[in-house]
Amino acid sequence: MVTDFVLQTHPEPGNVVHYEYALAFGSQSEMAPYYTAWQNLISKPDLDRRFGSIFIMMPLGALVVGDFYGTEAEFEASGIPGWLPKGEHRHIVLTDWLGSLANSAQNEGLYLTNLPAPFYAKSLAFRREDLPSPEKIDRLFRWVDMQHKGTPLWFIIFDATGGAIGDVPGNATAFAHRDKILYYQSYAVGLPLLKASKDFITNFHGQVLEACPTAFGTYPGYVDPALVEPQRQYWDANLPELERVKKVWDPMDRFHNPGSVLVK
């Protein structure tokens, strides 16, 4: 099989600002105002596209991390630092393109281990109009406080997206989530992985759906064996066209996984 890849490239950025804000809390409910402020920032329609950010909820606090592709002066002039939480531990690294890649590689290296670790995960994608209100965020974070997690190794990642990816029409490629500006992924890790941990992740997802009833879909590749209608969740409105292509080019379904497009 021969496949052509057509890529549109851009010059590498000259400067990169990597930032980390560590926030310590005694309870998840204390974290809600900080998450609300972060959500307000990443959902701004005129947000500088050079900015990327992740909010990570953890048992003892939160971590806000990301990159700004520009100089420190441009980062400050954007007004973004004024929206970010004023954590006790603030860490800013000024680097270049290669340095930012090395930093990302170093962070990825921290995840590598020779010990297999069972985990359970859920995820969901949000358009701007799907995002929860401050009141619903407060209720959601208070709910987390009251739950038995079954493991100390759990975390919930809120990952800002959008920007130039949304300039491409939604039906131009297989990727259907160009109107989304946020993904969340929740994880529980355990040796062994207890039912209580799975229940916590599953029920948190249910609480999110209750707070954001119009949110639908998730990023292709976020594997979830319990996902309802995975093909529709992954490919959304593009699924009929992908089913047509699948029928022509892979009628025997040789390229198959539980979430892949099926032959119809």
Which stretches of residues belong to each language-model region?
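Soluble FAD-dependent oxygen oxidases
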Residues: 1-264
